[in-house]
From Swiss-Prot:
<dbReference type="GO" id="GO:0051301">
    <property type="term" value="P:cell division"/>
</dbReference>
<dbReference type="GO" id="GO:0005737">
    <property type="term" value="C:cytoplasm"/>
</dbReference>
<keyword id="KW-0547">Nucleotide-binding</keyword>
<keyword id="KW-0133">Cell shape</keyword>
<feature type="binding site">
    <location>
        <begin position="110"/>
        <end position="112"/>
    </location>
    <ligand>
        <name>GTP</name>
    </ligand>
</feature>
<dbReference type="InterPro" id="IPR003008">
    <property type="entry name" value="Tubulin_FtsZ_GTPase"/>
</dbReference>
<comment type="function">
    <text>Involved in cell shape control.</text>
</comment>
<dbReference type="GO" id="GO:0032153">
    <property type="term" value="C:cell division site"/>
</dbReference>
<dbReference type="GO" id="GO:0008360">
    <property type="term" value="P:regulation of cell shape"/>
</dbReference>
<dbReference type="InterPro" id="IPR037103">
    <property type="entry name" value="Tubulin/FtsZ-like_C"/>
</dbReference>
<keyword id="KW-0342">GTP-binding</keyword>
<keyword id="KW-0963">Cytoplasm</keyword>
<comment type="similarity">
    <text>Belongs to the CetZ family.</text>
</comment>
<protein>
    <recommendedName>
        <fullName>Tubulin-like protein CetZ6</fullName>
    </recommendedName>
</protein>
<dbReference type="Pfam" id="PF00091">
    <property type="entry name" value="Tubulin"/>
</dbReference>
<dbReference type="GO" id="GO:0003924">
    <property type="term" value="F:GTPase activity"/>
</dbReference>
<dbReference type="InterPro" id="IPR036525">
    <property type="entry name" value="Tubulin/FtsZ_GTPase_sf"/>
</dbReference>
Length: 370
C-alpha cells in the first residue's frame, strides 16, 4: 500500500520520520510523500528526513512559533484557519500513486490531535483515497489536560478518518514517573513505525520473486479497516537459520538455483508460535481481543518458510480468538530476509480500560475545578 504521510505536531512528525527511516532500510518503497505541520518552530527544525519545503509552521501570528501550550481549542482553530497551507505539500505530489493518506499525531497536546482531525476532514473533501489516523496516547496518564485532550482528539480523529491505529505510549514505558528522554521516544516511535511499515510494505514488490502466494494488496488492508473505529497491531519477529554461505551455496544462487530446503513442521511451529506471540504479546493498543470486528495476518520472510497451511491454520485461530469470520491473511516473500515476522492487524477494537481511565482523570480534574 502506497501512502502519503502527514505528521501533525511534534509526536506526529517524529513518527513520520521513523517511517521514512524504516522505508530507507527496506525495498521496495511504500511512502509516496511526507509532510509535517506544527505550531512550534523548533520541533519542525529538528526534523531531518521530511523535506523542508513540506514542513508548515502555522499559528505563528498567535504563538510566535512557540506552540499553544496544550490548548487544543486554539490549536484546532488555527489549523482550520490555515488548512490550505497545511495541504500545500499535496499540490505537486504524486497523489494518484497513493492508495491512502496516513495522518500521525500525538493526542494529548494542543496541536497534533486537533490538527490531525482538521487535516483528515480536508483531505477527505479533496481526495478520493481513504484517510487513516495514527493516534498516539500521551504518557501523562494522570494529567487532566492531557486526558481531556486525548479523549477529545481521539473522538474527532475517529469521526474524521476511515480508521485510527492506536498507540498507547504509557503501556510501553517501564516507569511512568520518570521523564522520558528523546532517545526513548525515538525507540518507541521506531517500534510503531516497524509495525506500520511492515503492514504498508507487504504488498509492494519489485521482482517476481517477491510476489506472495496470497498477496496482501491495498484492498486487503482497506477491507480490514472498513467501517471505521480503532485498530491495534501485534508483532513478533525471530531470526531464521542462516542461508548456505558456502562457495557452492553462493554459486547456486548466482545461477538461479535458490531453492532452500525447509522442514515443514519447523515452519509450521514457527508461524504458530509467533502468531500467538503477536496476538498475546504487547499490542500497540491493548484491548479485549474478542472486541475486534476484523483482522489481517501477514507473514514476512524467505519464501521457503512461508508455509501456506500454517498461515491458514493460524488465520483460523485468530478467527476463534476474535469471534470474527472477517480475518484475512497474506504472505510477503523477502528472499534476502534473515528473520521471520508475523504482523496481526485487528480492526474495530474497543480499548475499554484505557478510555475509562482517561475519562476518570478528565472527570476528576473537572470536579476539582468546580
Amino acid at each position: 500500500m502506497n501512502v502519503f504521510c502527514f505528521g501533525a505536531g511534534k509526536a506526529g512528525g517524529r513518527v513520520v520520520e521513523q517511517l521514512l527511516e524504516y522505508e530507507r532500510q527496506r525495498n521496495p518503497d511504500f511512502i509516496s510523500g511526507a509532510a509535517a505541520c506544527d505550531t512550534t518552530a523548533a520541533d519542525l527544525d529538528a526534523l531531518e528526513l521530511i523535506p523542508e519545503d513540506a514542513r508548515a509552521l502555522f499559528g505563528a501570528t498567535e504563538t510566535n512559533g512557540q506552540g499553544f501550550d496544550g490548548d487544543a481549542e486554539r490549536g484546532a482553530a488555527a489549523a482550520a484557519d490555515e488548512h490550505r497551507k497545511l495541504l500545500e505539500p499535496t499540490d505537486d505530489a504524486p497523489i494518484a500513486a497513493s492508495d491512502a493518506f496516513v495522518v500521525c499525531a500525538g493526542l494529548g497536546g494542543g496541536t497534533g490531535g486537533p490538527t490531525a482531525a482538521v487535516l483528515a476532514e480536508r483531505l477527505s473533501e479533496v481526495y478520493d483515497q481513504p484517510v487513516y489516523g495514527v493516534g498516539i496516547f500521551s504518557t501523562a496518564t494522570t494529567d487532566q489536560q492531557h486526558a481531556s485532550n486525548t479523549l477529545r482528539s481521539l473522538r474527532q480523529l475517529v469521526s474524521k478518518t476511515d480508521h485510527v491505529f492506536g498507540f498507547d505510549t504509557a503501556a510501553w514505558v517501564k516507569n511512568e514517573d520518570e521523564p522520558i528522554s528523546d532517545e526513548a521516544y525515538d525507540t518507541l516511535n521506531a517500534e510503531l513505525a516497524r509495525r506500520l511499515g511492515t503492514l504498508f510494505a507487504a504488498g509492494e514488490v519489485t521482482t517476481a520473486d517477491d510476489v506472495g502466494a496470497s498477496v496482501v494488496d491495498a484492498s486487503e488492508i482497506m477491507n480490514t479497516l472498513r467501517g471505521g473505529g480503532l485498530a491495534t497491531l501485534g508483532y513478533s519477529e525471530r531470526p531464521l537459520p542462516p542461508r548456505d554461505t558456502s562457495v557452492v551455496g553462493r554459486l547456486k544462487r548466482l545461477v538461479g538455483d535458490d531453492a532452500e530446503s525447509v522442514d515443514q513442521i519447523d515452519s509450521l511451529n514457527r508461524i504458530t508460535t509467533q502468531t500467538r506471540e503477536a496476538v498475546r504479546g504487547q499490542l500497540t493498543l491493548s484491548c479485549d481481543i474478542g472486541s475486534a470486528s476484523r483482522g489481517l495476518l501477514v507473514i514476512t520472510g524467505r519464501p521457503a518458510w512461508l508455509n501456506r497451511d500454517a498461515i491458514s491454520q493460524n488465520q483460523g485461530w485468530i478467527e476463534e480468538q476474535t469471534g470474527s469470520l472477517e480475518v484475512r491473511n497474506g504472505d510477503d516473500p523477502r528472499p534476502d530476509a534473515d528473520a521471520l515476522s508475523v504482523l496481526v492487524l485487528l480492526g474495530g477494537i474497543n480499548p475499554t480500560a484505557q478510555l475509562t481511565a482517561l475519562q476518570a482523570v478528565a472527570d476528576a480534574g473537572d470536579s476539582g475545578d468546580a
